[in-house]
A protein has these predicted regions:
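Extended, charged low-complexity scaffolding/tethering segments
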Residues: 1-27
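Short acidic DE-rich linear segments
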Residues: 1-3, 135-140
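Short, charge-rich amphipathic alpha-helices with coiled-coil/heptad character
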Residues: 19-52
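Short, well-structured hydrophobic secondary-structure segments
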Residues: 39-74
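Amphipathic alpha-helical coiled-coil segments
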Residues: 51-61, 98-121
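Extended, amphipathic alpha-helical coiled-coil scaffold segments used for oligomerization/tethering
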Residues: 63-106
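Long amphipathic alpha-helical coiled-coil segments
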Residues: 66, 71-74, 105-137
Length: 140
């Protein structure tokens, strides 16, 4: 995979993170108004479920990427095993590592996105607790 494709993936994931950050900040701002709490509750729950769906999708993509890396590792190992020059194990590993660098970079981007999405779900869970506490204070 070329650097342009990796850069495009990074930009797409970054845009997704920015969009979710804006959404979560908007939800946090809506916690200030007790009169619109019903809408806020629905939006928090809806956003949380959408994030969970995206986590599932990213998990599938990570599994696919790991499968691709494993297959390419096997192919590269066989190629360097049958190489014209005798290579030591460390040399083979270095060559294979270089061959798989782009695939590993993609995997790293996907895993970082997964971690970020999981943290965002935790943030929305905490908002749910904040809503509950806010409503409990109102009833006092």
């Amino acid at each position: 995979m070329s650097n342009e494709k990796i850069l495009a993936l990074d930009q797409k994931l970054s845009a997704q993170r920015q969009e979710w950050s804006t959404t979560i900040r908007g939800l946090a701002q809506s916690l200030r108004n007790i009169n619109t709490m019903e809408i806020t509750i629905a939006d928090v729950l809806s956003s949380r479920q959408t994030l969970v769906d995206q986590i599932a999708y990213i998990n599938v993509k990570i599994k696919q990427q790991k499968k691709t890396i494993s297959a390419r590792y096997r192919e590269a190992y066989i190629r360097y095993y049958e190489y014209d020059y005798k290579l030591g194990e460390k040399q083979k590993e270095k060559f294979i590592e270089n061959d798989l660098a782009d695939d590993n970079m993609i995997l790293s981007h996907l895993e970082n996105q997964l971690d970020w999405l999981k943290d965002s779900v935790k943030t929305l869970d905490n908002m749910g607790f904040a809503i509950r506490n806010r409503l409990a204070l109102k009833d006092l």
